[in-house]
């Protein structure tokens, strides 16, 4: 073989060895996928580097994600950024507009959300809630005087109403006894009174007559009812009774007048008057559109700020509880090596080819140097 042939042969051999070596090294990153054994001993370099170090790689990737990529500070910064807020507000605005155009009733909307029998549940909740609150208030104030827990302003207004109540009672009484019904009632009362007196009553009836006595009593009765002293007397009596009532505890009031039963009876009447059915039959769009401006302009931004602030405040604790490093490790462990190889090669295919060609180039240069030494020496 001539000098040129030797020179060319060694360059080709060196280039082939360099290219094959680099290509083999790239393949050995992933392959073989499992270890091979010969005569009971594991063949060296099996499995490939990545399959062999898979557990360590998964652990390190988990730590890298939690310590350097998905850090609490980075997520907080993203959450509180104007971009996220604007996107969230845009979504809220679009959702509100969609709901404002909805033809569904409130009942249908709740049913679509999986909430069945909302009216019955609401009525039951209101009844239960008011019972609990009334019982709680009764236990809290049952041994305290009424005047101690009534607001001062309310007490002052009630105190001012006592004389007016006296005037109202006397006026209504006067109007009643001036009416035909009142006159008849007064006559019957006088008749019953005289009958209860036996012979004396019979004698009075015989001499005066029932109608004559009623006609004589009525003007005096009306005169008494219109008298200022009567009004003052009644106002004083009502004030005294009101003062006594204010000094009662709820327990004492309950003992005397069944105040607790009266309270719960009033509650039942109030709830019976509270009709929830019309609300659930309303069109959802009518309710939303009525407050659309306030929802998108006021409530949504405030709720968003509060929600993002709360999430940011508890984010570090949430991430610790999630243990993202374990999640990443589990996902990497479950990820097929074949798919990982395909993904890496598809991304770096050109670079790996260049590495192979570089190996061939370096091998060819080394072969040329070796040929030069062989020829010269």
Curated annotation (Swiss-Prot):
Its subcellular locations are: Cell membrane
Output the Gene Ontology cellular-component terms. Answer: plasma membrane
Q: Which cysteines are joined by disulfide bonds?
A: none
- State whether keyword Membrane applies: yes
What InterPro entries has UniProt attached to this entry?
Answer: DUF445 (IPR007383), UCP032178 (IPR016991)
Q: Kindly give the membrane topology term recorded for this protein.
A: Multi-pass membrane protein
* Keyword annotations: Cell membrane, Membrane, Transmembrane, Transmembrane helix
TM region positions: 1-21, 357-377
Q: Which PANTHER family match?
A: UPF0754 MEMBRANE PROTEIN YHEB (PTHR35791:SF1)
The Swiss-Prot or TrEMBL record describes its family as follows:
Belongs to the UPF0754 family.
Name of the molecule in the record: UPF0754 membrane protein RBAM_010020
């Amino acid at each position: 073989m001539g000098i040129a042939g030797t020179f060319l042969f060694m360059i080709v051999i060196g280039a082939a060895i360099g290219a094959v070596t680099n290509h083999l090294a790239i393949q050995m990153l992933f392959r073989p996928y499992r270890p091979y054994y010969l005569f009971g001993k594991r063949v060296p370099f099996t499995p490939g580097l990545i399959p062999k170090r898979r557990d360590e790689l998964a652990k390190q990737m988990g730590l890298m994600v939690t310590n350097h990529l998905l850090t609490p500070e980075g997520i907080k910064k993203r959450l509180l950024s104007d971009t996220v807020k604007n996107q969230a507000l845009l979504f809220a605005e679009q959702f509100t507009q969609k709901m404002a155009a909805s033809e569904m009733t409130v009942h249908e909307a709740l049913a679509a959300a999986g909430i069945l029998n909302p009216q019955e549940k609401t009525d039951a909740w209101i009844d239960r809630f008011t019972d609990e609150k009334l019982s709680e208030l009764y236990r809290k104030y049952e041994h305290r005087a009424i005047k101690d827990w009534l607001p001062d302003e309310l007490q002052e207004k009630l105190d001012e109403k006592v004389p007016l109540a006296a005037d109202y009672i006397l006026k209504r009484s006067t109007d009643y006894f001036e009416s035909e019904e009142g006159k008849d009632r007064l006559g019957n009362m006088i008749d019953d009174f005289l009958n209860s007196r036996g012979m004396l009553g019979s004698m009075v009836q015989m001499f005066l007559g029932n109608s004559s006595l009623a006609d004589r009593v009525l003007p005096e009765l009306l005169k008494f009812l219109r008298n200022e002293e009567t009004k003052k007397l009644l106002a004083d009596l009502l004030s005294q009774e009101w003062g006594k009532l204010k000094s009662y505890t709820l327990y004492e009031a309950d003992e005397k007048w069944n105040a607790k039963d009266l309270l719960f009876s009033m509650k039942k009447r109030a709830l019976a008057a509270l009709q929830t059915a019309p609300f659930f039959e309303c069109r959802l769009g009518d309710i939303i559109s009525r407050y659309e401006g306030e929802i998108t302009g006021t409530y949504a931004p405030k709720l968003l700020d509060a929600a993002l602030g709360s999430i940011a405040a508890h984010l570090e604790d949430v991430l610790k509880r999630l243990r993202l490093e374990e999640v990443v490790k589990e996902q990497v462990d479950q990820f097929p090596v074949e798919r990982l190889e395909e993904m890496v090669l598809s991304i770096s295919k050109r670079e790996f080819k260049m590495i192979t060609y570089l190996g061939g180039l370096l091998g060819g240069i080394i072969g040329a140097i070796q040929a030069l030494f062989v020829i010269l020496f």
